[in-house]
Amino acid sequence: MDKSKINFNYQSRAVYSANPQTSRGRLFHETMNTLRSPFQRDRDRIIHSNAFRRLKHKTQVFIADESDHYRTRLTHSIEVSQIARTLARALYLDEDLAESIALVHDFGHTPFGHAGEDALNEAMAPYGGFDHNAQALRIVTKLEQRYANFDGLNLTWETLEGLVKHNGPLLGPYAKNKDIPIDILQYNAKQDLQLNCFAGLEAQCAAIADDIAYNAHDVDDGLRSQFLTLDQFEQVSLTAALLNDIKKEHPQLDQTRRGYTLVRRQIKTMVEDVIKQSQENLARVKPKSISDVHQAEQTIVTFSPTMAVYERELKDFLFKNLYYHDQVLNRRNAAKRIVQKLFECYYENPDVMPENWHNKTAHLTNQELARLIADFLSGMTDHYALREYQHLFDCTDNFI
C-alpha cells in the first residue's frame, strides 16, 4: 500500500482550522493509523460506542414510544453532524472533527430529555448536581470500557476540547456559567483543555449546527404532533417570510408538504446566514492560526445580528407553544417523577440495580454512590427507564 497516495484532504484546510497532522494527541499515546486521520478515528470510535447506540431510544421533547417518526437523540445528532460538516466545508475547516464533536455532544443526556436531566440534577443537588456536558466527558473518558489499555475512548484533545467548550469558555471573563462541574475540573487536571479559551471553529460549527437542527426538528415534530399548526407560524418573523415564499411558489401545495418545505428552507436559510456572517467575522478577526481562534475575544461562527433576533423569536415561540403545551407538560411531569423515584429507589436499595452495577456499590461513600447511580440512570434509554419503573413499582404508568 502506498501511504503517500492516501487522500486525507489536508490541502483544503484554512490556516486557522484544526490540523490532524499536528493534533495535540490523546491522553494515552497511540501510533498513527495509516488509513484514517486522528479525527476520523475519533468519529469511528464514537459511532461504535454503546453510548451512541443508546441515543436511538432517547428523546428531547416527545417520549420514545409516542411515534416512530419523532426525532430521537440519535437522529438529532446525525442531523447536527450533517449541518456541522456543511459549515466546516464552507469555511475550510476539518469536517471530520466537526462531525465528531456533533456526534458526541449529546452523549451525556438522560432519558426523557430535559425533564429527565432536571429531575436528576435535583436529586444530585446534595452531591454536586448533574450536568450533561460533564456526563458526556465521563462517558468518553471513563465509562465506555472497550479497550485493553485504557478506560473511555481516548479521543483526541481537539474532540474533547470541543465537547467541553462548544458553547464557549468555562473560565475567565467570557464564561457564561461560573460553576464548573467537578468532573470537568478533575479531567482538566490530567489534560489541560484550556477552559479559559474559546473552542476551535469546528466545535463552534457543531454548536450552532445544534441550534439550527434543534429549531428545525421541533418545528417538524410540533407540526407532526398537531400541537402546532402552520397558521401559528405566521406569527413568527422567519417562518412567516418562508411560508409566504412557499405559498407564492406552490399555491396548491398540501399542508403536509408545505410543512416539510418550511423545515428545509428554514435550515437552508440559517446555514447560509451562518456561513456569510462567519466569513465576515473571519475577515474582521483575521486569525492566522488555531491559537488565534482560541484567544479571540468572541465566538466567530455565529448568526448575523438579524438572524439572531429571528432565531430567538422562534425559540421563544416554541417554548411557549410546544414545550409548555399541556400534553407535553403532563408527559414531562410523568418523566420527572420516574427519574426521581428511580434515583430514590436505587439510593435506598442499591441491590435492586443490575448485578454489574450493584457489585460496585460496596464501601462507597454517599457521594460516590449517588454519582454511580447518576451514571446508571443517565445512561438509560426512555424504554429502559420506563420498564425499570414499572418493574420496581409494580405499575403500568405509560405517560397517558
UniProtKB/Swiss-Prot annotation:
Gene Ontology terms: biological process:
dGTP catabolic process
Q: Does the entry feature the keyword Hydrolase, yes or no?
A: yes
Q: Where does the record place the HD domain?
A: 73-215
SUPFAM superfamilies named among the record's database cross-references = HD-domain/PDEase-like
Sorted alphabetically, which Pfam families does this protein's record hold?
HD (PF01966), HD_assoc (PF13286)
Known Gene3D superfamilies for this protein? Hypothetical protein af1432 (1.10.3210.10)
Residue ranges annotated as transmembrane are none
Extract one GO molecular function annotation from the record: dGTPase activity
Instruction: Reply yes or no: does the keyword Hydrolase apply.
Output: yes
Extract the PROSITE patterns matched here. Answer: HD
| Keywords linked to the UniProt accession | Hydrolase
SMART domains, per this entry? HDc
InterPro entries for this protein: dGTPase, dGTPase-like, dNTPase_2, HD/PDEase_dom, HD_domain, PHydrolase_assoc_dom
Stated family: Belongs to the dGTPase family. Type 2 subfamily.
The protein depicted here goes by the name: Deoxyguanosinetriphosphate triphosphohydrolase-like protein
Q: Which organism is it from?
A: Bartonella henselae (strain ATCC 49882 / DSM 28221 / CCUG 30454 / Houston 1) (Rochalimaea henselae)
